């Protein structure tokens, strides 16, 4: 009973971080199952496993997207790593609002329940994660499925807003003595920028889906031309949230990768301040490019020219980060342990995803490529290999600190190589399919596309084998069997530890710091 009370009512940032990780893992497995069903359907031309039910196919697409974005990447990145390590990294005893932290987590399971029930009610919600009207309107989706999905989004949105308020307050007000803003570890900076993005973008989404809800149920016509509304207004509102959202998913990953590259190159991060201002620039510019998702809806030519240029400008701070990671590794004494493998894999694959993004930024090219598999390949290279590789990298980097036990290195490396091979085999052929004109969200296709689709589906099965390997690693590491106890600082940085988590025991005590640490200087800015 006391154990149950501890986990239900916990206000400890480490306990809540662990809950987020468990929740993210469960949602991630479910989302992966949906993605495998999608790839099984697309393995060959014609109807395969769904019996020609095209609505069901789109329900799978929608559920896969929502699960992966709102219930896997965000809870694990921001809720898991953020809760676990932000207070430790800044020398704080806990988060600023511990009970708010608790409710932020416990809003997510009901939200997940609502999402899953939306897939089971009537014919499900087959709108895609964008939930565009008129497809999501009451005439096209007459049951309660879309309403349930909207309520699910509302709940997870409230959870994220409360969490971001908590992170902003914690980072601004609870830094230990001597921890100035310019001494903050890059992961903390990444969470801070992410929290601001959430705080500014989610209310816009909430407004859009609330208007959609009233259009569906109370006869308003916000998005219905018959009553003077405009479905394009919904697209503007959604993407004003949706584009910052993709940076919300990747920015904490940037912070994690910076720590790992620095640790395993035995060097401080190249251009610390440049890295910080690059993240802030990405955050600001992320709000100024939303209509590049809408080049095909009839925007004015000048508008398209602006959004093309603004989208390309985002590549500049992103490039600064990529080249700073490479410069950090340059001349370093690099150790290719599992976290570093995932970090290098991240840099390579994220760069490919970024380059295809530059292609899609051109409004003329995007008109040809919009809603084809080229776009699917692009954002999966950025997310399925960017955000997810950063998650795995962070797990292997900090797992000793979390569990207090070392992970099996060989199994970790096997996990990396299987996953690396699997995801590339899944998503690289999609570029060719997109360039050949294969449209997204359609469960059948002409025979001409059969070869690349078969290869892509085979790659997804390999990825599943890699994910199974990962859970084997988790099981071995968390059990008190053969693997040895983890040192305070497992990566041999004890001579010159750069961040505070390597100065506390593994796992940290329930109350991390007996007394608050005082920061005299950091490697980032040793002249302070």
Swiss-Prot record:
- Residues that hold Cu cation according to the record: 243, 292-293
Metabolic or biological pathway: Energy metabolism; oxidative phosphorylation
Q: Which GO terms describe its biological process?
A: aerobic respiration; electron transport coupled proton transport; oxidative phosphorylation; respiratory electron transport chain
Gene Ontology molecular functions: cytochrome-c oxidase activity; heme binding; metal ion binding
Q: Where in the cell is it found?
A: Mitochondrion inner membrane
Q: How is the cofactor bound?
A: Binds 2 heme A groups non-covalently per subunit. Binds a copper B center.
A Pfam family that this protein carries is COX1
Q: Which residues bind O2?
A: 247
**Protein residues bound to Fe(II)-heme a:** 64, 380
Q: Which UniProt keywords apply?
A: Calcium, Copper, Electron transport, Heme, Iron, Magnesium, Membrane, Metal-binding, Mitochondrion, Mitochondrion inner membrane, Respiratory chain, Translocase, Transmembrane, Transmembrane helix, Transport
Show the InterPro entries listed in the entry. Cyt_c_oxase-like_su1_dom (IPR023616), Cyt_c_oxase-like_su1_sf (IPR036927), Cyt_C_Oxase_1 (IPR000883), Cyt_c_Oxase_su1_BS (IPR023615), Cyt_c_oxase_su1_dom (IPR033944), Cyt_c_oxidase_su1_bac (IPR014241)
The residues the record assigns to binding Ca(2+) are 41, 46, 443
| GO cellular component term, pick one | respiratory chain complex IV
Keyword Iron among record annotations: yes
The text of the family note is: Belongs to the heme-copper respiratory oxidase family.
Q: What is this protein called?
A: Cytochrome c oxidase subunit 1
List the lineage, top down. Answer: Eukaryota, Viridiplantae, Streptophyta, Embryophyta, Tracheophyta
């Amino acid at each position: 009973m006391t154990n149950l009370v501890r986990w239900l009512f916990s206000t400890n940032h480490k306990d809540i971080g662990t809950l987020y990780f468990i929740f993210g893992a469960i949602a991630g497995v479910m989302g992966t199952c949906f993605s495998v069903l999608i790839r099984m359907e697309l393995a060959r031309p014609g109807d395969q496993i769904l019996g020609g039910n095209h609505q069901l196919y789109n329900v799978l697409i929608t559920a896969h997207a929502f699960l992966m974005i709102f219930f896997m990447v965000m809870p694990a990145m921001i809720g898991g790593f953020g809760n676990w390590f932000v207070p430790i990294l800044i020398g704080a005893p806990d988060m600023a609002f511990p009970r708010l932290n608790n409710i932020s987590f416990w809003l997510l399971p009901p939200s997940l329940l609502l999402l899953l029930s939306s897939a089971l009610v009537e014919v499900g919600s087959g709108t895609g994660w964008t939930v565009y009207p008129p497809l999501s309107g009451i005439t096209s989706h007459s049951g309660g499925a879309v309403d349930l999905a909207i309520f699910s989004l509302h709940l997870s949105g409230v959870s994220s807003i409360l969490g971001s308020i908590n992170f902003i307050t914690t980072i601004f007000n609870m830094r230990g003595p001597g921890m100035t803003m310019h001494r903050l570890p890059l992961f903390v900076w990444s969470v801070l920028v992410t929290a601001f993005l959430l705080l500014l973008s989610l209310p816009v989404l909430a407004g859009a889906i609330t208007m959609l809800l009233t259009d569906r149920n109370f006869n308003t016509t916000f998005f219905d031309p018959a009553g003077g509304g405009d479905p394009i207004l919904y697209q503007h509102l959604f993407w004003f949230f949706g584009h910052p959202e993709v940076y919300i998913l990747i920015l904490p990953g940037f912070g994690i990768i910076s720590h790992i590259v620095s640790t395993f190159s035995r060097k401080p991060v190249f251009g610390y301040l440049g890295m910080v201002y690059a993240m802030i620039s990405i955050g600001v510019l992320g709000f100024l490019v939303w209509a590049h998702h809408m080049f095909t809806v009839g925007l004015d030519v000048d508008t398209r020219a602006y959004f093309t240029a603004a989208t390309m400008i985002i590549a500049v701070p992103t490039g600064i980060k990529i080249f700073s990671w490479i410069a950090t590794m340059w001349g370093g004494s690099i150790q290719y342990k599992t976290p570093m493998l995932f970090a290098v894999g991240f840099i390579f694959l994220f760069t490919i995803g970024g380059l295809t993004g530059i292609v899609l930024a051109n409004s003329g090219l995007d008109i040809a490529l919009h809603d084809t598999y080229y776009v699917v390949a692009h954002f999966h290279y950025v997310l399925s290999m960017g955000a997810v590789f950063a998650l795995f990298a962070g797990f292997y980097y900090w797992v000793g600190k979390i569990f207090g036990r070392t992970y099996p290195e060989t199994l970790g490396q096997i996990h990396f190589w299987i996953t690396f091979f699997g995801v590339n085999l899944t998503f690289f052929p999609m570029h060719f399919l997109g360039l050949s004109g294969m449209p997204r969200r359609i469960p059948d296709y002409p025979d001409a596309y059969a070869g690349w689709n078969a290869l892509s589906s085979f790659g997804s099965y390999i990825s599943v084998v890699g994910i199974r390997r990962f859970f084997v690693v988790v099981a071995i590491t968390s059990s008190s069997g053969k693997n040895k106890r983890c040192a305070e600082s497992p990566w041999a940085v004890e001579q010159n530890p750069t961040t505070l988590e390597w100065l506390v025991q593994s796992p940290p005590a329930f109350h991390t710091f007996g007394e608050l640490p005082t920061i005299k200087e950091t490697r980032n800015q040793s002249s302070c």
